[in-house]
């Protein structure tokens, strides 16, 4: 009693305005211990040890040392905690129920208590007289919790596994020998996310009728904040609800609506519940023991519904773990599933708790003596009850060390690692990592048959810019392909030039060429890779012509006269293709050839002389076909591109001026022989041909070949004259 008076002094204990004390009571927590005389085993009807489920200290004046304990067999025992002799400690016991008693509560200020059991009833007991004062009947399942208001002696509340909360009043008359509920909250903690809408409830009488059963939404704990306010928690919805008892919840058919709700503040995705609720002495702070191993502290007076503090370090895996506050509201104690009890300082929730060790099974119900800070009671599934006392530091006897069955320990602070980026090898990545390029893994690179020029295939994002090692054969083939592709002139330019060239060289009487255009002809030549790319468009045209065709210049003015051209005056071009040549045989010079052949029979001597003269002239070498050549050098010197160092005359296919001196002499002689002739001596065909002569000299390329008709000259009247006449001329 001296210690209690010291704690109540303002300078040492709780201050008048509230929380902290000048005296460091935190250091006293390590002095709690349990002697073997304070350890009590809970027995059943047959003397078999059974686990105790609930314990609570009396609130009657000068009777605060009385401890009531209920066990699984329905027995209630009263312990005098002032006596440390085991024989005198338990002074009274009786069998309150034929089933397990899950909770019990003292009537405020009196030696009376109410027990809530698994037989679906609550019983009202007079402890001093040892009499049953009444039975409360109305639940359809086990009762899990019972609570009294702070200043009410006749009204109490119970919550059961049927999901209902019932309010009882012992002042009401009994019917059939049982007390009936005066108020009821049905389905207090039903989940709101139902797949189908609930059926409308029928209006029920608030007294004596059986309520609906909802065992899946069990009410685990009820607690009074004041005379008109009730706080409750469920097993699976994770919501703490505050109810106003002045409202009649049975008068409506819809679901009951709480005046205030505290949603589950944790991070678990599983539906969790609360096993215990504790209010401080002022009723403004609520401590909720959740099955996610946390105790949440809520402010009941404000509008904020999130917790103001969280206590952790213990384990809570069942709904039998309870909590309690010290008489000065400075410390919070809770049972735990790891065979220990934990004590936290309320003002320092981050501080490691003090651990009470000594039990061998889960610690369920705990209670701090409301009038004595130095006394704590704990129940465990090891079938024992331990009363913890503060070591006063008196002289210890030699046998006291061996009689200690409970001791304290300071829990070490767990250092939580800061959030650090975990390497990808230790964590599952969000996406598959990109494979690193290596000589052995070359799947992103192109195959050997794929064109290797830039722009054919885009590089994948995971493919490095450097080339992957390949075999020498593959390297050589790729180099040759690159060389051949780079040496070819641009396709659009060559196709355009060839189409323009075909259009220019075509005449109204000529037919389109049989061979496909150069843009569609895809015949590769070995010489392609060896010919350098021309810088001018004319050079590209010449190279394109040399690859695709070997052309001949059909010149009509070979031996007759420099001014004489083709009979049709078209400067046509034929190919070295048999089919094309046969098709073009009658295009332009058919009439002229027939005339020459007809005249050839009249003058065989002169024509033979002319033919001999024509054949004696050295003809320029014909261009070498790129298909027949196997060399790797450039084209022969006589084959020069068109337009290089010369001027284009007449047609687009004209060649630069490169006259042969023998042909020049022959042409000069022909001019001298034909100059004295009179206009009357000329035939109409000759006059027609002379009128169609070109104004300038016609250039002959060394690489072009003469037409067959140019080897024969048309005979005139002068050719049939006598030799004397020709000598005179």
Swiss-Prot record:
Gene Ontology cellular component annotations, sorted alphabetically: centrosome; chromosome; Cul4A-RING E3 ubiquitin ligase complex; Cul4B-RING E3 ubiquitin ligase complex; cytosol; nuclear membrane; nucleolus; nucleoplasm
Gene deletion effect: Early embryonic lethality due to cell cycle progression failure, termination of cell division, and, eventually, embryonic death during the preimplantation stage.
Primary location group: nucleus
Region (Disordered): 189-212, 416-445, 460-491, 504-546, 596-705
N-acetylmethionine modified-residue sites: 1
Key words of the record: Acetylation, Biological rhythms, Chromosome, Cytoplasm, Cytoskeleton, DNA damage, DNA replication, Membrane, Nucleus, Phosphoprotein, Repeat, Ubl conjugation, Ubl conjugation pathway, WD repeat
Keyword Cytoplasm: yes
InterPro entries registered for this protein in UniProt: WD-repeat_CDT2_adapter (IPR051865), WD40/YVTN_repeat-like_dom_sf (IPR015943), WD40_repeat_CS (IPR019775), WD40_repeat_dom_sf (IPR036322), WD40_rpt (IPR001680)
A GO BP entry: positive regulation of G2/M transition of mitotic cell cycle
Subcellular location: Nucleus; Nucleus membrane; Cytoplasm, Cytoskeleton, Microtubule organizing center, Centrosome; Chromosome
Motif DDB1-binding motif mapped to chain: 168-171, 243-246
Superkingdom assignment: Eukaryota
Assembly mode: Component of the DCX(DTL) E3 ubiquitin ligase complex (also called CRL4(CDT2)), at least composed of CUL4 (CUL4A or CUL4B), DDB1, DTL/CDT2 and RBX1. Interacts with CDKN1A and DDB1. Interacts with FBXO11; SCF(FBXWO11) controls DTL stability but DCX(DTL) does not control FBXO11 stability. Interacts with CRY1.
Protein name: Denticleless protein homolog
Organism in which the protein naturally occurs: Mus musculus
Gene this protein is translated from: Dtl
């Amino acid at each position: 009693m001296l210690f209690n008076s010291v704690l109540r002094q303002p300078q040492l204990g709780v201050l008048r305005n509230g929380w902290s004390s000048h005296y460091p009571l935190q250091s006293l927590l390590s002095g709690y211990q349990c002697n073997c005389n304070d350890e009590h085993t809970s027995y059943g009807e047959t003397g078999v040890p059974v686990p105790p489920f609930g314990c609570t200290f009396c609130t009657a004046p000068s009777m605060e040392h009385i401890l009531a304990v209920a066990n699984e067999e329905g027995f209630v025992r009263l312990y005098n905690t002032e006596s440390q002799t085991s024989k005198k400690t338990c002074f009274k016991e009786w069998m309150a129920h034929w089933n397990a008693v899950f909770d019990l509560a003292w009537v405020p200020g009196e030696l009376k208590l109410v027990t809530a059991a698994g037989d679906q009833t609550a019983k009202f007991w007079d402890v001093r007289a040892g009499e049953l004062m009444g039975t409360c009947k109305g639940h359809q399942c086990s009762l899990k919790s019972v609570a009294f208001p702070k200043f009410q002696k006749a009204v109490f509340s119970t919550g059961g596994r049927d999901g209902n909360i019932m309010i009882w009043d012992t002042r009401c008359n009994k019917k059939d020998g049982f007390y009936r509920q005066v108020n009821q909250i049905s389905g207090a903690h039903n989940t709101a996310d139902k797949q189908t809408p609930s059926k409308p409830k029928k209006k029920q009488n608030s007294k004596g009728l059986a309520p609906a059963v909802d065992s899946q939404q069990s009410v685990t704990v009820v607690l009074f904040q004041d005379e008109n306010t009730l706080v409750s928690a469920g097993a699976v919805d994770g919501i703490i609800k505050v109810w106003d008892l002045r409202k009649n919840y049975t008068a409506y058919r819809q679901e009951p609506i709480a005046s205030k709700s505290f949603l589950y503040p944790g991070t678990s995705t599983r539906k969790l519940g609360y096993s215990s609720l504790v209010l401080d002495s002022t009723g403004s702070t609520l401590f909720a023991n959740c099955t996610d191993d946390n105790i949440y502290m809520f402010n009941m007076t404000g509008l904020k519904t999130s917790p103001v503090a969280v206590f952790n370090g213990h384990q809570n895996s069942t709904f039998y773990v309870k909590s309690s506050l010290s008489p000065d509201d400075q410390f919070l104690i809770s049972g735990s599933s790891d065979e220990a009890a934990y004590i936290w300082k309320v003002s320092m929730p981050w501080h490691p708790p003090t651990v009470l060790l000594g039990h061998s099974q889960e610690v369920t119900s705990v209670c701090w003596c409301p009038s004595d800070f130095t006394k704590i009671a704990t129940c465990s599934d090891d079938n024992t009850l331990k009363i913890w006392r503060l070591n006063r530091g008196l002289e210890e006897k030699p046998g006291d060390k061996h009689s200690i069955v409970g001791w304290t320990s300071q829990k070490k602070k767990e250092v939580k690692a800061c959030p650090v980026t975990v390497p990808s090898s230790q964590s599952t990545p969000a996406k598959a990592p990109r494979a690193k390029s290596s000589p052995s893994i070359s799947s992103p690179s192109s195959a050997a048959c794929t064109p290797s020029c830039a722009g054919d295939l885009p590089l994948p994002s995971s493919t490095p810019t450097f080339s992957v090692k390949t075999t020498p054969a593959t390297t050589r083939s790729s180099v040759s392909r690159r060389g051949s592709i780079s040496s070819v002139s641009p396709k659009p330019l060559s196709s355009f030039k060839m189409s323009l060239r075909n259009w220019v060289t075509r005449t109204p009487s000529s037919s389109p060429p049989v061979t496909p255009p150069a843009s569609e002809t895809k015949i590769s030549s070995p010489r392609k890779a060896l010919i350098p790319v021309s810088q001018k468009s004319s050079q590209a045209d010449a190279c394109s012509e040399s690859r695709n065709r070997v052309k001949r210049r059909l010149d009509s003015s070979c031996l007759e006269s420099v001014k004489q051209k083709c009979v049709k005056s078209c400067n046509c071009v034929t190919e070295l293709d048999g089919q094309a040549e046969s098709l073009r045989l009658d295009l332009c010079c058919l009439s002229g050839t027939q005339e020459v052949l007809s005249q050839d029979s009249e003058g065989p001597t002169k024509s033979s002389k002319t033919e001999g003269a024509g054949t004696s002239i050295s003809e320029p070498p014909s261009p070498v076909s790129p298909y027949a050549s196997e060399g790797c050098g450039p084209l022969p010197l006589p084959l020069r591109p068109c337009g290089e160092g010369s001027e284009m005359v007449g047609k687009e296919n004209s060649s630069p001026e490169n006259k042969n001196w023998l042909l020049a002499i022959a042409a000069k002689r022909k001019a001298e022989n034909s100059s004295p002739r009179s206009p009357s001596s000329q035939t109409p065909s000759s006059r027609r041909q002379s009128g169609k002569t070109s104004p300038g000299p016609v250039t002959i390329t060394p690489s072009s070949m003469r037409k067959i008709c140019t080897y024969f000259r048309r005979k005139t009247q002068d050719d049939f004259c006598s030799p004397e006449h020709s000598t005179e001329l």
